[in-house]
Amino acid sequence: MASLLGRSPSSILTCPRISSPSSTSSMSHLCFGPEKLSGRIQFNPKKNRSRYHVSVMNVATEINSVEQAKKIDSKESARPVYPFAAIVGQDEMKLCLLLNVIDPKIGGVMIMGDRGTGKSTTVRSLVDLLPEITVVSGDPYNSDPRDPECMGKEVREKVQKGEELSVIETKINMVDLPLGATEDRVCGTIDIEKALTEGVKAFEPGLLAKANRGILYVDEVNLLDDHLVDVLLDSAASGWNTVEREGISISHPARFILIGSGNPEEGELRPQLLDRFGMHAQVGTVRDAELRVKIVEERARFDSNPKEFRETYQEEQLKLQEQITTARSNLSAVQIDQDLKVKISKVCAELDVDGLRGDMVINRAARALAALQGRDQVTAEDVGIVIPNCLRHRLRKDPLESMDSGILVTEKFYEVFT
């Protein structure tokens, strides 16, 4: 077990890729390839959600070439993003982000650290590594033409009627939530006057609708109003956003990867809110002089010629993107032994972690890490790497304890696993 601490997260990010499984491997709801869909589609109703499930036949979708061309033009004119592969250091933060991309059900990541340590740059660079998804053209919810759990109401009605859906391929959205955003801007608004006079539910979608099947990033989340944080975390956990005004209720899909960042010197999040983030990454200022020089020089190169700088890292970016895509495909095949599950729960119990979220997140993160490394079996080493990030923010604060919570988690891990 002594080898666990001898392996840095950077070695994980550069591990060899494995070949993709059969071409029929399923992908998660964030990744679909361009294709025509036809034939029978059958979805079974679920408890308390039957109105969002449909059963139809002979539904076909076709790629809209005009919309596709517009997307390509907008992509080329977009502001260049710093390459993820070019970010120096901060391996813990990068690993947490990658694991959430592989398995969005981990529950997002909270990144806390000093000012100017690359938190926002790293998060925004993540969008380049994500595959394109198929969405219904003109739909404000980025509806998935094949999954009713990710469909808006209008799209579901079209599917039920057997109408064709015009679809396009687009990059996954990275939605920024500003600190000054109101609840109506985040959740959406209902036009009460139109509802009363015309008898229709006039709904103006908010940021949660735009973030569906994408990433919602909240910078300085520790300064955001508590009630907005509650709304975000509830939507992220349930996958749905419900807006209720004057007796009118509207729900729409809101499945997104929630990423928050902040500086602990400016304020802490409530423990109840911290617990809702799947993982927690701590980012520190680089102290090595040579490494600091390298970071400054790389940033200067990017600022002077972003296009040329991005081309330098294009091959590494493509390799990492393929590795992520393969890991997402293989995730469902990754197994974790019962003995490891018991030991994980024992660590959580002995650390007096409230609830069971910690247990579930560790299991998911360890499986995602194994998939990233190209394996179908979780090892104790995988658990040892991810467990500090999964439990650090869930421990009860002791004002007399000066030791980092992550170290306490690691010590307990060795005690249980050896």
Curated annotation (Swiss-Prot):
Disruption phenotype: No visible phenotype under normal growth conditions, but plants show slight decrease in chlorophyll content. Chli1 and chli2 double mutants are albino. CDD domains: AAA. Pathway: Porphyrin-containing compound metabolism; chlorophyll biosynthesis. It comes from the Eukaryota. SUPFAM superfamilies: P-loop containing nucleoside triphosphate hydrolases. Involved in chlorophyll biosynthesis. Catalyzes the insertion of magnesium ion into protoporphyrin IX to yield Mg-protoporphyrin IX. The reaction takes place in two steps, with an ATP-dependent activation followed by an ATP-dependent chelation step. Possesses low affinity for ATP and may play a limited role in chlorophyll biosynthesis, and contributes to the assembly of the Mg-chelatase complex. Belongs to the Mg-chelatase subunits D/I family. NCBIfam families: BchI-ChlI. This is Magnesium-chelatase subunit ChlI-2, chloroplastic.
